[in-house]
Amino acid sequence: MRRALRLLPLPLSIAICLPAMAADKPLNWGLCPAVDPLPGFDGAPAADPKAAEMRQQLPTDIEGDQLSGTSTTPQYQGNVALKRGDQFLGADNLRMDTETGNYIAEGNVRYQDTSFRMVADRAEGNQDTDTHKVTNIQYQLVERRGNGDAESVDLQGQVGQMHRSTYTTCDPSQPIWRVRAPEIDVDNEEGFGTARNAVLQIGKVPVLYFPWFKFPIDDRRQTGLLFPQFGLSGRNGFDYLQPIYLNLAPNYDATLLPRYMSKRGFMFGTEFRYLYEGGRGEVTGNYLPNDKLRDKDRGSVFYSGYHNVNTHWQARSSISWVSDTRYVEDFTSRLNGMGSASSLQSTVGIYGTGETWTAGLMADRWQLTDYTLDEQALPYNRQPRAYFTWEKPFGIFEAGVYAEAVRFTHDDSYFVQPPSPSAPGETNNRDDNDEYVRTNIRNKEYGSGARLDVKPYISMPLSGAAWFLTPTVAWRYTAYQLDSTLANTAPLTGNRTPSRSLPIASLDAGLYFDRETSLFGTNYLNTLEPRMYYLYVPYRDQDDLPVFDTRPFTFSYGQLFRDTRYTGADRQNDANQLTLAVTSRWLRQDDGREKLSLSAGQILYFSDSLVTINNSNNSAAGSEQTVEQGKSAWVADANYMINDRWSMGATYQWNPNSRKEDLASLRTRYLLNNDGIINLAYRYRRNLTDNSDQLKQADFSFLYPINPSWSAVGRYYYSLLDRKPLEIIGGVQWDSCCLAVRGLVRRFVRNRDGEMDNSIQIEFVLKGLSSFGQNTDRTLRRAILGYYRDDLYLVPPSNTTTNPDDYDPNLIP
């Protein structure tokens, strides 16, 4: 009797064929009815994945109210039930012929297993020839939403055919959308299905027609069309992208990406992915012949991949190339010049990690992507860079070393001629083709050089229940080998082998006090955590040292406890200074959550710090304010959790020398019901070199649920200095059990010149099937912090990154 259940997997195979194309995004099913369209059947076994895996080895039990016929032609009548593992088949009547293999199940035919549920009028077939037919089917997917019906299903072995079938994730009483197909062929052995004349309906209106397409019915990938993306923008006009997936092999595939932009023409793109036991990779290329707006060919290539050499070593590479300096602006929708980089980095290297060590050998190169700048804005290329770090405790001591050897190169710089200024009274009125012109006049010839930096240290971390004390001594040696071009570049003195050697001593100490207290009827644990950090570094003249990759750190609370002001090894500031800081927290005793935290600190400079980065050979390194004897700016951080929904934070820096604030930021967040959120922020920064205002911005964003189905989204990002918006977003979202529609209108700064662009984004999400239109998630997730509520709880990036290529030697010890 075990073979009597052979027909049952067929409806499952066909039912999952369309949802197999569903997107990977998390879906909200909260608006769906709590009751399944097909409730579970009485007497059916409970869902059990383990029983589903073993069903072929389990016996079949048959029961019914009455049994008649003969031993070769048994007939079961009334409440017939067949059970095997997690499978259940019920019917009013079941007739069988054990000699011919024929069977007929009639009246209220029901089937259920761990992932699938079905009702039908009749099922018949022959077990010997493995042919089956089921008529008038209604089905439901149990593990994920999805239901539909079919007029009939025919099965011959592993091949089946469904007639006049539908699929939707909507409630059957309100099918907002459904897919209809008069004929679907399914091959379980090959793992694909073929639909003919399929139509996607929204309501009763057909919106997409597929005369023929193949699709997967299991995890095996199949070649075919993916859902399109489309949008509208002032830069590109109507924008349509039709992905075509190519399943080339089990471990590699490709996607063709033809794209039409009404203002530019056809762009041809492709994406190739590969996977093997030791690694994976992905390469993407795009080519636009004869861009209508630029009158030239455009293109890009991006590659990323890795290979695991063994348990300690991994090779990684990331290659980026674009055809011109306008490409990023024209074909990305980020805040170019404001929130995106002016250059692309390509990196290749091998990296190792052990219990007490990290090491690596890599090389990188930079490409300019901002047409308003010349090559002077690019960082130096590292070709190559080798580094090694080691640290290990020895009793009460801890010892370690950081070593790095780098060869730096740089492309020569050529003058960029800006376009003619606008007429009086006009602003940014020039045509798109009136570009900056890159001349052949050399602006600066860069040489090359190599640098060795070694920093051994030894520390003695001591601590108790309410205190810690860590004295540290380090020695830093840095040496260069420069070519004549670089060595004779002002203000360098012509020395081709300059070097620097100096000790670094620090003492880090802190105390911890706490007490129990009560405020407004709530019990708190109040802490007081004073901290002291003394740093001494003798002065060394470093004017003859080039500046390759060194920049001043942005002054912050964390900077109070670093042993250098710089990110790289080209400068090591002299110091005789003491940091005094204190932190106080209020922790709720019932759950340990932090109600309020306050931190403040200041550096006391006992002497002038003579080392600066000013007037270096590298204009891109910028400049900094000299550090004089006295006091640094006060740095204060505060975070206040008003309640479980409302939080506030602030950062403030006040300079006692200028009696002005150097930096101020205020941010507040309110969490609404139904995952809504409101963000408000203000940011201010003063230019310390000329005391002018450098940045003054206000940022307001929200996701406001109007009701369970409708919500509004928006952002207003405004520059108070320029008196103009940087980005404006407005949109609405409509959500239902099975369909979501999002529409956005966006106006944003598209380049460093402050020119604005407009775009319209519309996306349809057929839950459980796919989405088409322009992806709005990426835009909203960037613009509205907390658009995905889980983003609020992600750990922010820190300087103690585990990526060895990003390891900062100045954070050792």
Swiss-Prot record:
Subcellular compartments: Cell outer membrane
Signal peptide positions on this chain: 1-22
Predominant location: membrane
InterPro entries registered for this protein in UniProt: LipoPS_assembly_LptD (IPR020889), LptD (IPR050218), LptD_C (IPR007543), OstA-like_N (IPR005653)
Top-level taxon in the UniProt lineage: Bacteria
Transmembrane domains' residue ranges: none
Gene3D superfamilies reported for this sequence: Lipopolysaccharide (LPS) transport protein A like domain (2.60.450.10)
GO cellular component, one term: cell outer membrane
This protein's record includes keyword Signal: yes
GO BP terms: Gram-negative-bacterium-type cell outer membrane assembly; lipopolysaccharide transport
UniProt entry keywords in alphabetical sequence: Cell outer membrane, Membrane, Signal
Subunit structure: Component of the lipopolysaccharide transport and assembly complex. Interacts with LptE and LptA.
Entry-linked HAMAP family: LPS_assembly_LptD
NCBIfam families for the chain: PRK04423.1
Function: Together with LptE, is involved in the assembly of lipopolysaccharide (LPS) at the surface of the outer membrane.
Family (UniProt): Belongs to the LptD family.
Protein name as it appears in the record: LPS-assembly protein LptD
Organism: Xanthomonas axonopodis pv. citri (strain 306)
Gene name of the record: lptD
